[in-house]
Amino acid sequence: LKEEIIATSASGLAWTIVYIALIYRGLKDKSYGMPLVPLALNFAWELVFSIIYPPSTTGIAGTIINGIWMLCDIGILYTYFRYSYNYFYNRYKITKLTWIGLSIFAFIVSFEIMFIGGPFFGQFKYYFNGDIFQGAIFIAYIQNLIISVCFILMIWERRDSKGQSLTIGVFKCIGTGLTVGIYYLFWQHHGKAALMNIIVGVTFLLDLLYILTIYRQLITDGFNPWKRL
């Protein structure tokens, strides 16, 4: 339990830095840094698993961290709804009403996934010990894999660094694979969680690729990667 609280707290701090950096860069660049799908999944996860199904093993510490993340997500939501429509219009030529409808639909579906998914995975006692929040952790790692893919695709599609920074990439990597990822695989499951080994391992490699990609893009855009928050 002590190791879990340490890993969760370290991950919570790292991801809070990621969220603050996303908000800061979004406002500074008048852009948005988290694509719609991972943003909707993230917000729904933190809403459901801090209020409806709060963590049982990490207690109040886990609930507070999830609550802080949910509040940070509101800031990221602002940058998305404030600045993303132009990107959608330029790329897909959709109307603002269509964009709003698709965005709302993404958030509704994400909420349903989290609300139903936690209990669904939690029912498998052999792997998740009948604990809904253990199911939530599994969902979170799949979600993190999606985030990593979307971050890379966003840079490749935009061909600029707006809304992004090396800070986001480095602390995402720390907050996922190098903290709770290590705990989950080697302390809790002793390296025997084959599927999670693949998910966490691939996510870690994609995070390294994202760090390299944003570093090169910042150089191309004329920024010092180490001085851009």
What are these regions (language model features)?
Residues 34-52, 66, 172-181:
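Hydrophobic alpha-helical transmembrane segments of multi-pass membrane proteins
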Residues 58-67, 127-137, 168, 190-200:
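Non-cytosolic membrane-interface motifs at loop->transmembrane helix junctions
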Residues 27-39, 161-168:
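Membrane-interfacial loop-to-transmembrane alpha-helix junctions, especially the N-terminal start
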Residues 14-15, 68-78, 143-150, 202-213:
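Hydrophobic cores of alpha-helical transmembrane segments in multi-pass inner/ER membrane proteins
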